[in-house]
């Protein structure tokens, strides 16, 4: 099976999706979800009770609001440990952390210091939540670290040019 599953901007959850994710993480999988996920059901009706719908316990948080930035407006996400920061634009989701641990926080605006990325241990696995539409370098570096920790080996050791995808079967 898969060691890591990435679900970016998974706006709509089809029936049964939450249970599949729950079992995957409980059994040791690594799940990565981003902002604007679990907002509606398969009928495009808003999920009641909070988002990400049906996975708040797995993710260890509840979304409270999302700040849509104007064109050209940016914010910063800063690592909780270390001196690393990245720019973000378009979307900055605010979350209320329950059991998740912040890995990155926002650096500016009224939500400075609030989580921009979290990790939650659930069962035998981990669930990561990316709250910000950060620059590509953020995703390259963070995903590389998560995938390595999960024990996924790269098919090629050298850098892969932009626009090229490498997969193994």
Model-derived features with residue positions:
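A conserved amphipathic helix/loop scaffold
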Residues: 8-169
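Aromatic-Pro/Gly-enriched surface loop or interdomain linker
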Residues: 1-3, 120
């Amino acid at each position: 099976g898969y060691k890591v599953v990435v679900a970016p901007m998974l706006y709509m959850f089809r029936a049964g999706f939450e249970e599949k994710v729950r079992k995957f993480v409980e059994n040791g999988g690594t799940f990565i979800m981003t902002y604007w996920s679990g907002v509606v059901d398969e009928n495009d009706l808003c999920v009641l009770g909070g988002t990400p719908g049906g996975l708040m316990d797995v993710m260890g948080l509840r979304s409270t609001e999302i700040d849509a930035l104007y064109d050209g407006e940016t914010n910063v996400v800063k690592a909780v440990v270390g001196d690393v920061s990245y720019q973000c634009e378009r979307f900055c989701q605010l979350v209320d952390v329950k059991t998740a641990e912040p890995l990155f926080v926002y650096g500016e605006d009224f939500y400075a210091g609030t989580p921009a990325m979290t990790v939650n241990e659930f069962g035998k696995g981990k669930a990561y939540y990316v709250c910000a539409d950060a620059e590509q370098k953020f995703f390259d570096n963070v995903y590389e670290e998560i995938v390595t920790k999960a024990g996924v080996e790269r098919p090629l050791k050298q850098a892969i040019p932009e626009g090229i995808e490498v997969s193994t079967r």
